[in-house]
Amino acid sequence: MLETKWVAEQLGRPVVKAFNSISIGSLRNHGRPKGSPERIALPVAADDQQAKDVIIGLIDEIGFDGVDAGGLDASWRQQLGGALYCTDLSASRLKEVMQGLTDDDYAKLGERRDIALKAVMEWSHGLIAGDLPRLMRSLAGLPD
């Protein structure tokens, strides 16, 4: 069972997964006005469409594009090691990447997570603002 589904089950409440997919540096420094070409998109996964719509609106208000990423069963794509985790993609690029993900990508999630954790731990004292998105894009096989 995916962690997000487990959390929803434990809480007995709707869960919306969104803000785990952006680093604190990007959240703090990269909000942009609607329509800006540099605007970062956040994938938003939830089984409750109304709750998802509320969070997409909130994301827009703080300067990012919220993109419907399906239900919680699809939320693995935005977990550490997934192609949508902290990659700072535009809405159009995020949708493109999301559509191209397969069961093979899901199968590699654990391995990519372990590699990412190791790299972040090794860089913990020297990680600078743009490093995490570049590292995550590299692990996902996305161009920088």
Regions found by a protein language model. Name each.
Residues 14-20, 67-69:
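General beta-strand structural signal in soluble alpha/beta enzymes
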Residues 23-27:
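Rossmann-like dinucleotide/flavin-binding elements
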